[in-house]
C-alpha cells in the first residue's frame, strides 16, 4: 500500500499512543515462564508482538487475547517442544530473547523469520549463550534460520562489545536456567525493561552501574502488567508538533523510563518546548503525559552514551535536523546498519530525494539545516521507523509526498496514520 501525505498548517489535540513494544514482548515471555497467571493491559497489537504470542503458544503456553488485554497462563521455566518451526516474522526482539529461553530447555527448536530477520546478525547472541553451554546451529555467518539445542547452562561474566538491550535480555533470560550467577557488563546502559520486570516477577537482579547480576533459583510469579504508551511511537508526534507551525499536542500515559528518553533530551537541547506532567510509576516504569509546542530548533552533536537511549528515534531526529538552524552531527550509531533496514543509508537516501542536505557517514550522518523539503515519492524499505519518519517529513514538505509500502507501520503502530488524522 502506498500513502500520500501533504503539508500541515497546524497540529492540535490530545492523543494516546499504543502500548510499549519492548514491555509488551517481555511481559508475554516472562509471564510464560512464570508460575500462575499474568494479566497484561494495553498490550501492543503490532505484528512483532503478535509474533511473540504465537511463538509462546507453539511452546505450549495458554495465551488469551481480548482487545488489548492479554492473559498468560504461566508454565514455569520449562516449556513444551514446538511441533513446528517458530516463525518470528519481522521481530528481532522475539528471536533474540527467545534464544535465551530456549537455550535452557530440554529440547531443540528451530527459529526463522522474514527476509529482514535472515539478514540481521545473530552472532552477538550466539556467542554469550554458547559460553553458557548452549548449542546453537545457524546459517553461515550466524544468520537465521537457526536451531537452539537446549542444554544445562552455567553462569558467566560477559563484557558486551556494544550496548544492546536485546542481547542483554537474552543472556538474562538464559541466566534463569544457569547453575550459578551471571554478570553482564555493558559499555553504556541500554533500556532496562527486563531488569525492572525481572524484579517485579520475583527474580533476583542486582544492578551496579553498567553491571547487571542475575541469580538463578528464584521462582517467577505471574503479575498484572499495565503497559504504558511507547515513547518510540510518541517520538513522531513530538517531532511533528515541534516542527509544524502553530501546534500543541499532548500525548497521554507515555513510558518515560530514563533509558528511553533520549528523544526528549535531544529535542529539548535543540530548543524544543516539551513539558512532562502527571509523572508517576507503574510496574516499576516511569510514566507521564508529554505536551509539545512548536519551536525553533538549532543543530547539535549527538553521540556516545546518548545513542542507546534513542537508537530507534534517530531517523525522525534526522527529519527534525533538516529544519534546525545550523548543522546536526549524529555519530556512534553503527547499530542502525543492522536494524530492519540499514537506517543510516535508508533515511539519508530518502530525505535526499526530498531535497535535504544530508550525508551518510561510517557511524551516522551529518545534516545541514536548510529548513526546506519538497514532496516526492519515497520508499519505506518495509521498515516501520523509516515510513513513520518520512510521514513527518511529508507534513513539512512543499507539495505531496508518496510513501511506498507504507503498511509496514503495522509492525509497531497499526493506527499511526489514523492518529495523525485526528490532530
Curated annotation (Swiss-Prot):
It is an enzyme of class 2 (transferase). Phosphoenolpyruvate binds at residues 21, 92, 120, 166, 343, 385. One of its GO terms (cellular component) is cytoplasm. Pathway: Metabolic intermediate biosynthesis; chorismate biosynthesis; chorismate from D-erythrose 4-phosphate and phosphoenolpyruvate: step 6/7. The active site is at residue 312. 3-phosphoshikimate binds at residues 21-22, 26, 164, 166, 312, 339. Its EC number is 2.5.1.19. Gene3D superfamilies: Enolpyruvate transferase domain (3.65.10.10). It comes from the Bacteria. Keywords: Amino-acid biosynthesis, Aromatic amino acid biosynthesis, Cytoplasm, Transferase. It is found in: Cytoplasm. Its main location: cytoplasm. The keyword Repressor does not apply. GO terms for biological process: amino acid biosynthetic process; aromatic amino acid family biosynthetic process; chorismate biosynthetic process. The keyword Ligase does not apply. GO terms for molecular function: 3-phosphoshikimate 1-carboxyvinyltransferase activity. It catalyses: 3-phosphoshikimate + phosphoenolpyruvate = 5-O-(1-carboxyvinyl)-3-phosphoshikimate + phosphate. Catalyzes the transfer of the enolpyruvyl moiety of phosphoenolpyruvate (PEP) to the 5-hydroxyl of shikimate-3-phosphate (S3P) to produce enolpyruvyl shikimate-3-phosphate and inorganic phosphate. Belongs to the EPSP synthase family. Monomer. This is 3-phosphoshikimate 1-carboxyvinyltransferase. It comes from Thermoanaerobacter pseudethanolicus (strain ATCC 33223 / 39E). The gene is aroA.
Amino acid at each position: 500500500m502506498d500513502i500520500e501525505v501533504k503539508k500541515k498548517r497546524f497540529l492540535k489535540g490530545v492523543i494516546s499512543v499504543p502500548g510499549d513494544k519492548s514491555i509488551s514482548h517481555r511481559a508475554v515471555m516472562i509471564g510464560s515462564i512464570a508460575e500462575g497467571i499474568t494479566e497484561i493491559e494495553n498490550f501492543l497489537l503490532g505484528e512483532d508482538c503478535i509474533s511473540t504470542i504465537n511463538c509462546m503458544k507453539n511452546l505450549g503456553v495458554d495465551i488469551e487475547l481480548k482487545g488489548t488485554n492479554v492473559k498468560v497462563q504461566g508454565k514455569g521455566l520449562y516449556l513444551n517442544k514446538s511441533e513446528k518451526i517458530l516463525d518470528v516474522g519481522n521481530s528481532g526482539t522475539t528471536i533474540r530473547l527467545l534464544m535465551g529461553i530456549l537455550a535452557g530447555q530440554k529440547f531443540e527448536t528451530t527459529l526463522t523469520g522474514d527476509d529482514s530477520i535472515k539478514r540481521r546478525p545473530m552472532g552477538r547472541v550466539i556467542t554469550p549463550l554458547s559460553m553458557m553451554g548452549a548449542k546453537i546451529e545457524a546459517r553461515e555467518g550466524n544468520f537465521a534460520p537457526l536451531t537452539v539445542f537446549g542444554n544445562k547452562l552455567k553462569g558467566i561474566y560477559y563484557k558486551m562489545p556494544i550496548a544492546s538491550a536485546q542481547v542483554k535480555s537474552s543472556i538474562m533470560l538464559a541466566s534463569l536456567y544457569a547453575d550459578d550467577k551471571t554478570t553482564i557488563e555493558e559499555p553504556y546502559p541500554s533500556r532496562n525493561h527486563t531488569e525492572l520486570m525481572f524484579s517485579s516477577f520475583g527474580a533476583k537482579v542486582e544492578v551496579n552501574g553498567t553491571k547487571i547480576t542475575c541469580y538463578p533459583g528464584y521462582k517467577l510469579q505471574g503479575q498484572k502488567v499495565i503497559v504504558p504508551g511507547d515513547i518510540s511511537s510518541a517520538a513522531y508526534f513530538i517531532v511533528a508538533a515541534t516542527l509544524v507551525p502553530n501546534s500543541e499536542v499532548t500525548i497521554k500515559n507515555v513510558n518515560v523510563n530514563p533509558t528511553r528518553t533520549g528523544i526528549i533530551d535531544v529535542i529539548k537541547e535543540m530548543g524544543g518546548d516539551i513539558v512532562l506532567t502527571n509523572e508517576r510509576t507503574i510496574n516499576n516504569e516511569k510514566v507521564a503525559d508529554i505536551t509539545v509546542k512548536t519551536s525553533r530548533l538549532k543543530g547539535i552533536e549527538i553521540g556516545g552514551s546518548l545513542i542507546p537511549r534513542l537508537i530507534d528515534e534517530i531517523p525522525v531526529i534526522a527529519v527534525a535536523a533538516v529544519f534546525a538552524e545550523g548543522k546536526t552531527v549524529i555519530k556512534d550509531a553503527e547499530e542502525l546498519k543492522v536494524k530492519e533496514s540499514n537506517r543510516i543509508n535508508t533515511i539519508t537516501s530518502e530525505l535526499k530525494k526530498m531535497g535535504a542536505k544530508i550525508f551518510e557517514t561510517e557511524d551516522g550522518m551529518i545534516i545541514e539545516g536548510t529548513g526546506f523539503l519538497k514532496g516526492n515519492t519515497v520508499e519505506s524499505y518495509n521498515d516501520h521507523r523509516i515510513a513513520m519518519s518520512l510521514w513527518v517529513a511529508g507534513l513539512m514538505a512543499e507539495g505531496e509526498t508518496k510513501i511506498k509500502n507504507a503498511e509496514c507501520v503495522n509492525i509497531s503502530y497499526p493506527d499511526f496514520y489514523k492518529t495523525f488524522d485526528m490532530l
